Design a protein with these regions (language model features):
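Intrinsically disordered, low-complexity, charged terminal extensions of DNA damage-control enzymes
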Residues: 1-115
Length: 115
């Protein structure tokens, strides 16, 4: 009988970097889960605590259970994106090949603001 592998718990923070009606998305790099698909950038350190908390997305991938805090970070001007990143209108996200967690984050980002 095969032993079940232990599920590893991970926490991460996704940044919904917003300028006007556009958000910054990043293409998953070779060797990452969902290589080549678009997603919201993950941030660490001080950046992971910056901005308004929009919600939480939980998902599982290959013996990993991940809790992803979603934070909004509004920037005053649209900066040039890094390699593998681009600005997309929030309404244009549905046309991108996105990860499943990325789609859930997009739905949170597109939801009307709550008081």
């Amino acid at each position: 009988q095969a032993r079940r592998r232990e599920v590893k718990q991970l926490r991460e923070t996704a940044a919904v970097v917003r300028h006007g009606d556009a958000v910054l998305v990043a293409r998953r790099r070779p060797g990452e889960w969902w290589e080549g698909l678009w997603d919201f950038p993950r941030v660490t350190g001080a950046a992971a605590r910056r901005g308004r908390r929009l919600g939480l997305v939980a998902y599982s991938v290959t013996h990993h259970r991940i809790e992803c805090t979603v934070r909004e970070q509004v920037v005053p001007r649209r900066t040039k994106p890094a390699a593998g990143q681009r600005w997309v209108k929030i309404t244009g996200l549905e046309s991108l090949a996105m990860t499943a967690p990325g789609r859930r984050i997009a739905a949170i980002a597109a939801a009307p603001e709550r008081p």
